[in-house]
Design a protein with these regions (language model features):
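Amphipathic alpha-helical coiled-coil segments with heptad-repeat character
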Residues: 23, 27-30, 34, 51, ...
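N-terminal interaction modules that seed assembly of large macromolecular complexes
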Residues: 2, 15-81
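Alpha-helical oligomerization segments
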Residues: 141-179
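Charged linear interaction tracts used for macromolecular binding and regulation
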Residues: 54-144
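Coiled-coil heptad-register positions
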Residues: 26, 48, 120, 124-127, ...
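Conserved structured catalytic cores and adjacent interaction surfaces
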Residues: 11
């Protein structure tokens, strides 16, 4: 009577003589690097990894994989930068681990915040005026709900998209001159 083999045993038996090409090995190694960096950055953003520990782990990773450039880290951090979020921890890592000047990114984010605040205040003012004219509702206690205002949500989405485009152009340039 024959031996009953598991699917894993059958697959291993069929593939035991296969080897990876050098391209496949490089691709697999790059994927492993990307996943490790992604994991480190997520832990850092979640507060489970301090900045110093992240820097130490990253240096070990660079040594383990003989990495001379920081492109993978730059790309991962770039993906995480958003104009309406607190990006200081990410920008600090870009500055300290990758020696990148983040002034352009910081300027775009600051400009977004100022424009967003100003636009929201203007919209609140317009909504208060509309309430006063249409319903004769006035007073210091009147505070329109911007989240419920479709016109504001559309305006905010468009404003954010414009700043995201600016950020993306700057982020694309981060790898400029680095290979």
């Amino acid at each position: 009577m024959g031996e009953i083999k598991s699917t894993l045993d059958l697959v291993l038996e069929k593939t035991k003589n296969l080897t990876l090409s050098s391209e496949e090995k490089e691709e697999q190694e790059q994927k492993e690097i990307e996943n490790r960096i992604k994991g480190m950055m997520q832990k850092y953003q979640d507060g489970m990894l301090s900045k110093n520990q992240l820097k130490t782990d990253y240096e070990i990773l660079k040594k383990d994989y003989n990495m001379s450039q920081n492109n993978t880290l730059i790309i991962e951090i770039s993906k995480r930068i958003e104009p309406d979020q607190d990006n200081r921890p990410l920008l600090e890592i870009l500055q300290e681990c990758c020696t990148i000047d983040t002034a352009a990114i910081e300027t775009i984010i600051e400009n977004f915040r100022k424009a967003y605040f100003e636009a929201s205040q203007n919209r609140i003012k317009r909504l208060k005026e509309d309430l006063a004219l249409q319903y004769n509702i006035t007073g210091s206690a009147v505070l329109p709900n911007l989240a419920a205002d479709e016109q504001w949500r559309q305006e905010a989405r468009e404003m954010r998209a414009g700043y995201v485009d600016q950020l993306n152009r700057v982020k694309d340039n981060l790898l400029g001159g680095r290979s």
